[in-house]
Amino acid sequence: MKINVLGSGYMGKQICSLFVTLGHSVNLWQNTSEKLDQILETEIKKLNKHFKINNNGNFLIINDISKLEENLTIETVTEDLRIKKEVISKLSFKDNIFSNTSSIKLSEIGENINGFHFMNPITVPLIELCKRKQYSDILLNELIM
């Protein structure tokens, strides 16, 4: 599955690394010039060791949000409503967008936003899925797997 992760802070890096470890192709959008390649490779190695798996996922760091294509998209930017809305408004698509927020109401972020909240640290085997907008059962099954 192809996945977009919006935001390269602590949780964004962790979520990206987790999906790569699970064998997915991840586009990680960042709005900074931080060099992430080595950081992500280190995180992926840690998760491979923790979960005792080594799937062949990959990641691509994207600086231009307009280049992201419609895929499962997880927003992980800072817990600031204005910033979340601004980032999401720059996407060229409006479906299959999930937020990792833990403190902002999904309805305040946007009409089409669902929740996909990962715990910290990412190795905690618990994910909160909040369904607000209809999405396909196929996508739901992929999320659960």
Set out the residue ranges of the language-model regions:
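NAD(P)+-binding Rossmann beta1-loop-alpha1 motif at the extreme N-terminus of oxidoreductases
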Residues: 1-50, 60, 112-113
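Nucleotide donor/acceptor-binding cores
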Residues: 1-3, 71, 127
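Conserved RecA-like P-loop NTPase ATPase core
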Residues: 11, 73, 120
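Short glycine-/acidic-enriched loop or helix-start segments at secondary-structure transitions
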Residues: 15, 84-85, 107-110
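Rossmann-like NAD(P)-binding element
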Residues: 34-35, 48-96, 103
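A non-catalytic, amphipathic alpha-helix used as a structural packing/dimerization or gating element
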Residues: 35-42, 83, 138-145
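Rossmann-fold dinucleotide-binding core
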Residues: 77, 96-145
